[in-house]
């Protein structure tokens, strides 16, 4: 595997993370049978205050951004990997980075149906604490069910 460099987000990364989000999010929503709930990153990031997260990282491989994440001290809230780089351990590298920078992270929500993401987080000690129903953040006209995953820090 080629080496992965993870660094803090820079404003010049915006277009690349839009593309990563928009392609990967469609897969995530399809797994949860929520295809019609898609919003492009340019909209979702504003509605969900993405740029207010204190930690936003990007992963670079072969000279291009291939993943991004956003998190607080308690929650890993966003993690998307470029579709062509899924299953290359990049998601794992991003989770490792987040847990190194914010070791108190103990909460993640995963859409029910997104089993690949659930398995990724389980490999880091997260377990399903409950399944919660509500509305999709940033797109409240859609009902969602999420795995509420926790871990001991």
Regions found by a protein language model. Give the residues of each.
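A conserved beta-strand-loop-helix scaffold within acyl/acetyltransferase catalytic domains
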Residues: 69-74
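Conserved GNAT acetyl-CoA-binding A-motif
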Residues: 101-113
């Amino acid at each position: 595997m080629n080496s992965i460099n993870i660094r803090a987000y820079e404003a010049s990364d915006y277009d690349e993370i839009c593309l990563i989000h928009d392609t990967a999010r469609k897969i995530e929503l399809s797994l949860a049978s929520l295809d019609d709930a898609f919003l492009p990153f340019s909209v979702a990031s504003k509605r969900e205050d993405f740029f207010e997260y204190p930690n936003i990282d990007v992963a670079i491989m072969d000279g291009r951004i291939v993943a991004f994440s956003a998190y607080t001290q308690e929650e890993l809230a966003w993690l998307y990997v470029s579709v062509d780089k899924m299953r290359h351990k990049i998601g794992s590298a991003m989770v490792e980075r987040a847990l190194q920078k914010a070791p108190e992270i103990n909460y993640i929500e995963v859409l029910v149906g997104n089993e690949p993401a659930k398995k990724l987080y389980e490999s880091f000690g997260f377990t399903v604490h409950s399944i919660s129903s509500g509305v999709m953040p940033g797109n409240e006209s859609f009902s969602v069910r999420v795995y509420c995953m926790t871990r001991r820090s």
